[in-house]
Amino acid sequence: MGEAPTVNQAPSREEIRMNSNWRADPLVWGHGPTVFEVFLEPTCPFSVKAFGKLDALLDQAGEERLTIKLRLQSQPWHMYSGVIVRCIVAASTLETGKAAAKAVMAAVAAHREEFEFARHCGGPNLETTPNGIIKRIEGYSGVELAEAFAIPDLDREVKWHCKYARQNGIHVSPTFMVDGLVRADMSSGDSVADWMARLPA
């Protein structure tokens, strides 16, 4: 009798631990001198509104004029915030880097209520596990996340986003910074034209 066929198995946690040679692609678009940083929580309705305007802002401003840096602002009252932020960071380590991370954010934004809790404390997601959230995001985004999510020291990138926000005194989402200064006069309710008017000429 011939040998049993080899079954491709997922790497063990020890194998993943031995290979932590990973890099999170910075969530940066454009390369202009004006730096527009936006701190977003992926399931926050106001963050979702702001996220939906970033492409239009970059198109209108031009990649030669503006650099957009997306910062992840996890918030504990959005109950699966930590899991979803880790999914976004995990996506950024994949071959397509920030494009995969953006696809994950767009998928969550498009189905935001399926990743939230009713009044932050109830609803169907009480029965959902972190693995269920990962699979749901994979289904909507087409991005395979589970293996990258399991990178043991992936939290160092998640912590960087947290520390960066804290050192800048940022606690809410969305928050906007232009050239290193918080702009309290900017909000998700503004039009792209309003944002453009607040950028340096």
Predicted feature locations:
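C-terminal cap of thioredoxin/glutaredoxin-like
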Residues: 4-5, 11-18, 24, 38-59, ...
